[in-house]
From Swiss-Prot:
Signal peptide: none annotated. Keywords: Aromatic hydrocarbons catabolism, NAD, Oxidoreductase. GO terms for biological process: 2,4,5-trichlorophenoxyacetic acid catabolic process. Its EC number is 1.3.1.32. Belongs to the iron-containing alcohol dehydrogenase family. It comes from Burkholderia cepacia. The keyword NAD applies. This is Maleylacetate reductase.
Length: 352
């Protein structure tokens, strides 16, 4: 076995159907008394429900989170938290809402309690991202790692099936890249493979019955593991491309992961054959890139960048940006090869 470094940095996790009932207990355990509740506009009713549970412990609701965390919105949210005298942020929703909480925490140090309603996994990481003038800047900082995460599968029952699958594939992307990370280790590998298996196994019954609470629990469990590995090791080409394309063209986050993942894995497959075998085994397919592409296509999800609204002329810019700053990846970053990858992803070509 090769030498490795393992360091655990994970939040307190409260998991189970009905776990939202423990919200007040968990806020008290954090030592907080003045919570600002965050959500997207679409989940403002959920935010109001959370504020109602908190009662006097809630000082306001900020229902304006949006994908890729525009820097102007982050500033406004920080000012609102300061104006209200908030001593913590409670983020209910997906990665956009957790991301806004992180943007607040990065400057203010406010602790975050996250209540995920998708499978994004951001709640388990010290990774933040903000978008300024079409460029998404990401980084790692211990201040943005949520203090506590409440995983309540009942809160995912209303997640539309297309979003369920795309969010699940987003989570699988985290685990897939961790399996060939240069700083990976055996513990992370076990968590990643189990996370992929749990989500993959849950998606089929959920497509038949989106209200299957057992499958919802399995998917959320898998998302927890996939998010944890995202926060523990470095990501490669897939995540770089998604951050580049998402920030530059304002493309939907989960669907973008769905489109890019099969092609990024195909690009790396010759240099990461063991990782590809583990991903395929966890999903019960013969080929990881083709298996993930086929799953998305069967589920009626977009499988091309064109379908997401990206302009074809953006391919050259994206290829330039993808190789601008070196980062670890199993296969060397070759601009022409990445341009071909992007062309295939743009046209929705099934990986060979």
């Amino acid at each position: 076995m090769n030498a490795f470094l393992f360091e655990a940095r994970i939040p307190r996790v409260v998991f189970g159907a009905g776990a939202l009932q423990h919200l007040v207990r968990e806020i008290d355990a954090m030592g907080s008394t003045r919570a600002l509740v965050l959500s997207t506009p679409e989940q403002s009713a959920d935010a109001e429900r959370v504020a109602g549970i908190l009662g006097s412990r809630a000082v306001g609701v900020f229902p304006r989170a949006t994908m890729h965390v525009p820097i102007e919105l982050a500033r406004e949210a920080r000012l609102e938290a300061s104006r209200l005298g908030a001593d913590c942020a409670v983020a209910i929703g997906g990665g956009s809402t957790t991301g806004l909480g992180k943007a607040i925490a990065l400057e203010s140090g406010l602790p975050i309690l996250s209540i995920p309603t998708t499978y994004a996994g951001s709640e388990m990481t010290p990774i933040y991202g903000v978008t300024d003038n079409g460029v998404k800047q990401t980084g790692r900082d211990a201040r943005v790692l949520p203090r506590t995460v409440i995983y309540d599968p009942e809160l995912t029952l209303g997640l539309p099936i297309r979003m369920t699958v795309s969010s699940g594939l987003n989570a699988i992307a985290h685990a897939a890249e961790s399996l060939y990370a240069h700083d990976g280790n055996p513990v992370i590998g076990l968590m990643a493979e189990e996370g992929i298996r749990a989500i993959g196994a849950a998606l089929t019954p959920l497509q038949a019955n989106p209200a299957d609470l057992v499958a919802r629990s399995d998917a959320l469990y898998g998302a927890w593991l996939c998010g944890a590995v995202l926060g523990a090791v470095s990501m490669g080409l897939h995540h770089k491309l998604c951050h580049t394309l998402g920030g530059a063209f304002n493309l939907p986050h989960a669907e973008l992961h769905t489109v890019i993942l099969p092609h990024a894995l195909a690009y790396n497959s010759a240099r990461a054959s063991q990782a590809m075998e583990r991903i395929a085994r966890a999903l019960g397919v013969s080929s990881a890139p083709r298996g993930l592409f086929d799953l998305a296509e069967r589920s009626g999800l977009p499988v091309s960048l064109a379908a997401l609204g990206m302009p074809r002329e953006g391919i050259e810019l994206a290829a330039d940006m993808a190789v601008k700053n070196p980062y670890p990846n199993p296969r060397p970053l070759e601009r022409d090869a990445i341009r071909v990858l992007l062309e295939h992803a743009y046209d929705g070509v099934r990986p060979s």
